[in-house]
Each structure stands twice: as structure tokens, then as C-alpha cells.
Amino acid sequence: MLNGLTRVSTSSELESILDIVQSSGEIAVVFISPSIGDLETITSETQRRQLRIAGIPRGGYTILPAIPLYDDELLQMCERYTAANDYEKAQIRDSLFMREYPLFAYSVRNHKALFHPADYVSRILQFCSYYVQAPDADVLSLLDRSPFLHISPIKEICTHIRLIARGTPLAPEDSESPAPEQLRFHAESDAEKLAAERAGAMSIATSSGGASETEQLSLFSGVVPSALFQKDAVEEVDKDTEETMVDLTGEETVDAVHSFQAEYLTLDGLELVTKAAIFYDREGEGQRIVAVYIPGGVPEDTCRAAAAVLEPAATKKNLRALTNGGLPPDTGLVGYYDYLTNPTRHKCRETEFSRRNWGLLAQSEPLLKHLDKLYSQLAPMHHHLQKVAIPSQYQLCGTVFSTITVNRNFRTAVHTDKGDFRSGLGVLSVINGEFEGCHLAIKKLKKAFQLKVGDVLLFDTSLEHGNTEVINPEIHWQRTSIVCYLRTGLMSSVCEMERRKHLNRLILQQLRNTEVLNTTVNINGADSSLPPLFVPTRLASHLAPVQLAALGFIVERTEKQSGCVVAMTMGLGKTLVALTLCFSQLHLAPQADILILTPKPIISHWVDEKNKWAMHGLHFPHFVASDGLNSLEFEQQLLEYERQKNNEKPKLGHVFVINGEYLAGFLRRFKRFTPLLIIVDEGHRVAAKGNKLTESLDRLRCNLRIVLSGTPLQNDASELYRLVGWVNKGVGRVLPPKRFQELANDINQFVEGDDGAFYNAVMAQEYIQDWMRGFVFREMENDLPPLHDYLLICGSSDVQREYEEKLGLTETTMTALKATEHRPHHLSTHPACYLAFISDSYQSMVSGWTVRAQANTSRMRVSQLEEIDTMRLEHYVQMVENEQLDTFIDLSGKMRVLVDIVLRVQARKEKLIIFSLYVGSQDLIHRTLTALRVCTFTVRGRDSQDRRRRAMQEFSENKDLIVLVLSTKIAAYGLDFTAANHVVLFDSWWNPQVDAQAIARAYRRNQRKPVTVYRLISATENKFVLSSQTRKIALFKCILHERTSRQALPDELEDCAANEKDEERRSFWAKLKTTLLAGGTRALLNVYRYQESVRESE
């Protein structure tokens, strides 16, 4: 039924009529007929093009152009026009041609417009003016003659203004219109209501008291406002104790002071700058602007007018005593601030002074506009990046500033400013006073800048700076200065989610109790400053707050022609975020194309997600995926696209989901392919140096680039730099690669154990975080059940120790082994796995646990084993065949621990996933567990997508299937195994994010149980891998979790077996520690909590 309602074929005659409306701006009347189509066809195609439809004349329908203004803009314009005299009305009509119409550009995309949107708006204004003044008798007749009275928001606006002007209600009695300030629900009309009624009639429940499944799934049945969003996605407001008025003044932190002893600068050793100049931090490669000095940059009268309003903001209630010799100075904040560390629900909002004085602050607008203009002229790239980054609702007077620090008679000690946007600059100006000296000095430059009233300094606030001495301080002196900047905390995921909840509450307020009948809703419609964000009405309630916040972050960047990185921890639903973004973009630009690049194993996951959410309204005209399951269908879709590109058929939007290996061939075939949007899943791949994928993507003319990654840092910080630089090319011009690498080295030095590097590491960490916040949406936390993550150090049997000695394996020699040396890993699995590996006998092991070679080459390799090795291998095979399983298992510490874990999980009637990097280990584990009669299924990297899908379904539905054995590096991606709540990492890789991806197959959305992770580590071969992992995890925490972290030293790790809080688990650890392997070594030597392998600094 859904497909029938949402995918209708369109007649060529109807297409031609709608093309004319869209291009000419004229209205058209259509009637249901075989050549035009039925009502569903007409409404569906009209909606897709964003045209409007009215249910007149009788028996027919009138098609109108899209309205090129947001609802609140149109309301304000109509109110002004209806209240104006004839001369003023002419001026208003003339001014229509001087403004921009972004909605118009969207609605006529790929159609050459033959009319100016101002003409259409003028017609609406004139109609509204006539309607408001018309006699009651004429109003009634207008219902049958004017289609404007049948479309939203025009009919609501006319009603509202007439009611205020004349006290006469709107004549139409059949309209249950929401308030005129409602957000725009796309193409609301009489005709659409008729379609809704028809669909609703098809889905009425026949059973007593209950709704049928059809009714619940119908896209045309109404949605009550309370069901539009998840409950926790809507802001809660306690009217009795309104938290937005809580006084937090004085708790803001804007400085980073690096000593408890205040350091004051003097002019000694500093050059005094008095002439306009630009300063860089170094010569040659890697230089960047750190200061721009503009004496007399702002007229003095502009400064003093603003000072009269801003000076009262400077009080002694603040936390800046350390920058004033221990005494609180006169200082304060104006605008917006991020109270992220305060225990209040509303963390991102106006300062108290701003809340109380918004009306007066308008007098400071000329100053702010002037400073903003100077900034854009003298540091254009910094200004551009700041304009891209700043959320619209935090812009002061439409500038790139969110916050102003006001200082009065305050000679600051040496400090750096904390929390400023590092791709931008702070803008300092003295706006009032009589004084001598008190110059602003920057230590690194060895320069002091003379600042009098009207002088301006743009500078990098992360550099240590302070004021020089005041000359003749005994004479009464006065000095008021301001610093304007962007607070990066306002772009945090906390603020994004808070803002999203606030917008959702406004939407529900505007809807009041009106049932939502439309299939699509603009969830940004409550704030006209935000770009539109359309989502299917029935999908909105399935989007978690973090997903809605991520969508809001993305569309604000794309509206400003910038990309971004979406760094959400695995399992939070990045794919649904991206699909919803695609839906909104195609809703606004129905003929555009979108390119999604993803690893081949994940393509089927995208298809599954698209199909899963289709029942909630997430539909696309063409969704083309190269998943390899149906190559004929894929080719047919490409041929259809070719016909549309060649104008043989009407062009519709396409979403292409392809893997990077196919991209070059795709671009050769479609040489003029120009996507509106590029999304790269597992986007850390574009961070690699010399990446051919990046080279191919760079040839596409597309600025809107979105990177999705739960693990944007894989090995080092430079990867994040390359990611951000790829989504926005401008960042490299304000932070050169050489400078970023210096910062990364400071962090790495501390991460690797140099405690003396702590101060530099903290400074570098804060700088990088403040630099990337405008372009990286980070949400590394989740609200999933608890995760218990353990390191299990396993012993070695006597046979394993014998081979370790032969290989010369010690903790020291392991550090010298290459990553391609796999013998130690196979030996840690089991001696049988090691012997099979060096004899290349995998194939025969899989086929029947025999070492009989099938080819001369294999015979030669087997014969190269020493005689005792050959005998041992045959003996091990016989052990399994003769069901001497305990003896066989006790030859390996890892295998013994693994089997006991599996049997424990089986006894608890739970499920387990085992990840391993090596085919030999996977085979041995599978055979051993099968011999133990544990129902086990194995998925390897070479397995087809269909097999993987069947594995997911079987594992979820078959209660007897206890264990899945998966390939870590390949099968871990794109799979959902939340049926399991135990995960074993049988071996670990150098990159901890590979292991993290594996764990996320079970620990993700929809997981309802606590998850336990067991990382099996041998005493020798895996310890160096663990050391490499913890270093990278510490780096990851430093940069993405904002926690200064380092590797734990060996003596800092504490065995947790004895103090385990869970009694059953404590007993289990004790049992494993008393279990002996062949040769008498304990199977389990130590148990550590994995998170303790990385230490966070206070």
C-alpha cells in the first residue's frame, strides 16, 4: 500500500503543465482524466516539485507556484503592506526586487525560471490587502474564485490580519487551520486532505477498539503533535522555576592562566606598534596570521555610544582574579555563553546581562557591524570560516560574534583566552576612556600594540598576551575595552541537542492540538533564521535527540556551502542521519543527485536501512546501490539515469551508494556527474596520504562533503586534520599543516608517557578542540546499557613455550617484529594452528581435520616440518577425532579461557560473538566448539552479503545458535548482532578502532542488555599490540573526548579479579586462575579492566 501511495507514475501531459507552472510562475487548472491522472498522481507530483494545489474550481484543481518566502517573512510583509498607504505600498513592491529568495532557488532548481519571485510575492501582497479591506459579502464570493484562500500559509495570514484589522473572522468554515505563525507543512491543501481521507478510509480498524496495522503504517493518517517527537527530544520547561532565568553570572571561564603568580608585562624588550600592519607567527612555510592592527578603525562616536550600553556589564562578579593579581576585576560577558560545566538543564544561552538588556543592546549594533566588516576585509578566510561555524541563533546583530567580553579599568596579567574559535580571531577594540599606556602585548611576537579609543586589533587569542603598565596610574584613569569572538562550546553536541529540543517544543506549541496530516515536516520551521530541514512526519519520532542534533549541525554547514565531519560513536545511527539528510536535500532539490561512498561490505547495510525506514516515509525517487546482489538491476538503473541525463526522460533525483573501487569507473561513464552532496561513510579512509579515492572525489565540483565516522582518528592526529581539510579547504589556510603537526607532537609526547609534557599537551589539546568544533559534530557518549570491558592475560602451555623459545619470542623481541609476522599470533591460538600455518595446511584442516596434502606443493611444505612437528600435528588431529577435547584445549591458554567463557554464556542462555583476525584461528575455534556440541556459525570476510544477512537473521531468531565466529577486519563492518551481549576479541590489531568497530556490532542502538567484552591477550605476542593500542586510545580521548590522557604504566595496572563487584563473575575469574594448562601454567594469569589501560589526568 505504501508503494502505491508514494510512487505513482506521472503522465507526460501533467509533467508539461507542471513544468509551465514551475518555469513561468503562472497558475494552471487541471481535471482528473486518463491523460492527466488521478488525484493521487496529481498531489504526489505537485508535492515532489514543491508546488501548491488548491481544490477549486469545482471538480478540478488549481496548481500554483511554490511560495518563495518563509511563513513568518510572508506574514510580516503582509502586515506591513496592508497597513501601508499607496506610496508606501509602491516602495514595498519595489524593494521586493532587491532581496534574495533562497526558497525560490530550491523550488525551480533545474528549471529555467521565466519570472522573478518578486512578481509572485507582489501578487500575494496585493491579494491580501484587498481581502483584508473587502466587505463581508465579497469575502464569501472569493472562496469560489481565489485559489490563494485554499493554500497555507496565505489563507491563515489573511485570516489573521483581517481579524485584527476588522474583528471579522475568516469566512471559510471548512478550514481547521493552525495559527498563522505555524511552520510550513509542505503543500497543505484541500486536495491533499481529500487524499488523506481516502487513505484513512482504507486503513480504518475493523476490530473493536484497536487500530489495524495498515492504519499505523499509513503515511496519510494524521499524527497528533505529542507523537511527533520522542519524549526526550522535546525541551522540558518548569514554569514555576524557569531555569532560563537562573543567575549564573560570574561562573563563566574565559581565561587560561598558567601560574598562580600573576605575570605582568612591561614595555621593556617589546616593540611598540603604532602603525597599521599584519603580523605572522613565522616566516616562509607554515606561516599564519596572528595579529592585524588597525589604528582608528572605528569612529569614536560609534565606540562611545556602544560604551554607554556595554560598560554596565563589567562587574566584579567573575572568576578572573588570577589575571588581576588576585582581586576580581571589573569585567563581564555580553551575548551567549556555554555553561557546559554547570549543573543546569539550560547550558547554552544568553548571559544574565543580555537577558535583562536585549532592548538596549541594539545601540551597540553599529559598533559590532563595523568590527565585523573590518574583520571580513582584513582577515577574510578567518572571517569566512567563523561565519560558517557560528550557529545562526547565536549571532550578535548578524555578525560572526557570539560573545563580547567587556573589561573596564582592567590591566590583564599574562593569559590565553579559553574556548575561542581557533579558525577565527578575537577582535579587540577600546571603546571609551582617558589613559596612557596599558598597551596589549603578545609575548611570542615581542610586540605591544597601542590601543586608544577606536583602535582595533584582530589577534590569535590562544597566544599569551596581557597589558603593559599604565602610565601615571596615580592620576584617575578610565579604559573600557571589548573583545568580540565566537565561543566554541556553543557548537558542542550538548548545545546542538539542547537547541534541537527547544525547536521541537516551539513546533509543538505552534501546532497546538492540530493533527499533522502532511507526509513531510520542516523541523526547523520554528526558527526562520535556520535553513529548512524536511523529514518524513512519521520518521521524526524515531530520530533520537543526538540524531536530530547532528542533522541540525549538518544543514547549517551545507547552507553555508561547507562540509563537516560527523563523529558519532558506533551504534548511534549515523546511517539514518545520512539518509534523512538525503531526503531533505532531495525534497528541496528534487532533480539533484547525491553520492554516497562506502566500503563494499557496508553497501547492503545502507540498502537495508533505506528499506527499513521506508515504512516511515523515507522514500527516494531513485536509490541506486552497487551491492553486487543484483548486477542486472544495477545496470538497468544506470541506463535509466543515462536516459534522464540525456533528456530522453524527465530528470529525477538519484542517490548513488557505491564503493570506492567502483568510483573511477562510474565517473568515466558519467563524465558530467555533478552531485549536490557527497557523503563518505567510514570516512577516515579519505584521511590517508596519497589516497586515490580522495583524488577522484576532488575532481567532482561539490563543496558539500560530509564524512561519517565513529573513529575519525585511527593512528595519529594528522588524520583528523586531513579530514577537516577535505570537508572545508579553507582550514589549511588559517592553520597550516606544519603548525598542526607541532600541536599533535605535543600531545603525542605526553600520551607516550612524558609527564613533563603535560602543560604543552593540555594547551595543544584545547587548541585543536577549539579549532575543529565548527566543522566536527562529536558525540562519543551514549545512553546504552553498561559495558564491562576486560583484558584477560592468558598463560602458555609447555608446548607453546617450547615454540616461543624456538622463535626467540620475548617481550623485548616482540617489539622488533613486523606487523606482517603472523606466526606468534597463530602460536598463541594453539600449537595445531601454528603448525598448520607454517605448513600451509589450512585447506586440509578445514576440509576434515587431516594433514594429508592434496598437491605436490603442499607435500613439500609439510615435509619441511621437523618430524616431531609432523607427528604432533597428526596427534592433535587425532585428539579431536577421538574426542579428547579437554587435552587438546589445554594445549593453549587462550583456547582454554575461550571455551570456558563459551560454556558459561551457554549456561546463562545468552549469546556470544567471537572476533578473530586470522582464518586459521577462526577455523580452529569453529571446529573446537562444534566438537563440543556448541551450535556455532562462522562468517568470514570472503563470504557474500547474502550469507552475512542470513547469519544475522539466523542468529537473531534461532535460540539454539549460541556463537558467531566473525572476521574482525571485514565481517565486523555493517552488521548488527545485538542478539549477543558477550563479545570475545580472540586477538587484537594494532589499531584499536578496528576492535572498537567489532564491539559495536553488539554494543549499539537496540541493545537492551549489559555487554561484556573479553580481550584475550597472551603473555608475549599481544603485549606490544596492546601498548600500541593504548597510546592511540589516549590520543583519541585527548582530542575527541576532551580528556587529557596517557598510557598507563605497567605498575599502574591492578588485577581486578579479587575485587570484582559481580559475585558470579568474580567466581568465574577465580576458577580460570586455578585451571592449569598442559605443563602446569595457569590458564588465566591476570584480569584488568580495559579502560584502566589509559589514565586520565586531573
Swiss-Prot record:
Disruption phenotype: Does not lead to death. The genome contains reduced level of DNA base J in the DNA. GO terms for cellular component: nucleus. Its cofactor is Fe(2+). It catalyses: ATP + H2O = ADP + phosphate + H(+); thymine + 2-oxoglutarate + O2 = 5-hydroxymethyluracil + succinate + CO2. It comes from the Eukaryota. CDD domains: DEXHc_Snf (cd17919), JBP (cd20332), SF2_C_SNF (cd18793). Residues 1-540 are annotated as: Thymine dioxygenase. GO terms for molecular function: ATP binding; ATP hydrolysis activity; DNA binding; DNA translocase activity; helicase activity; metal ion binding; thymine dioxygenase activity. A motif (DEAH box) lies at residues 681-684. Keywords: ATP-binding, Dioxygenase, DNA-binding, Helicase, Hydrolase, Iron, Metal-binding, Nucleotide-binding, Nucleus, Oxidoreductase. ATP binds at residues 568-575. GO terms for biological process: base J metabolic process; double-strand break repair via homologous recombination; reciprocal meiotic recombination. InterPro entries: 2OGFeDO_JBP1/TET_oxygenase_dom, Helicase_ATP-bd, Helicase_C-like, P-loop_NTPase, SNF2-like_sf, SNF2/RAD54-like_C, SNF2_N, SNF2_RAD54_helicase_repair. Fe cation binds at residues 415, 417, 465. Binds 1 Fe(2+) ion per subunit. Residues 897-1057 form the Helicase C-terminal domain. Residues 541-1098 are annotated as: DNA Helicase. 2-oxoglutarate binds at residue 479. Gene3D superfamilies: 3.60.130.30, P-loop containing nucleotide triphosphate hydrolases (3.40.50.300), Tandem AAA-ATPase domain (3.40.50.10810). The keyword Flavoprotein does not apply. It is found in: Nucleus. Residues 555-730 form the Helicase ATP-binding domain. PANTHER family: DNA EXCISION REPAIR PROTEIN ERCC-6-RELATED, SNF2/RAD54 FAMILY MEMBER. In the C-terminal section; belongs to the SNF2/RAD54 helicase family. In the N-terminal section; belongs to the TET family. JBP2 subfamily. Dioxygenase that catalyzes the first step of DNA base J (beta-d-glucosyl-HOMedU) biosynthesis by converting thymine to 5-hydroxymethyluracil (HOMedU). DNA base J is a hypermodified thymidine residue found in the genome of kinetoplastid parasites, which is localized primarily to repetitive DNA, namely the telomeres, and is implicated in the regulation of antigenic variation. Probably also acts as a DNA helicase. Recognizes and binds specific regions of the genome, hydrolyzes ATP and allows the DNA base J de novo synthesis. This is Bifunctional helicase and thymine dioxygenase JBP2. It comes from Leishmania tarentolae (Sauroleishmania tarentolae). The lineage of its organism: Eukaryota, Discoba, Euglenozoa, Kinetoplastea, Metakinetoplastina.
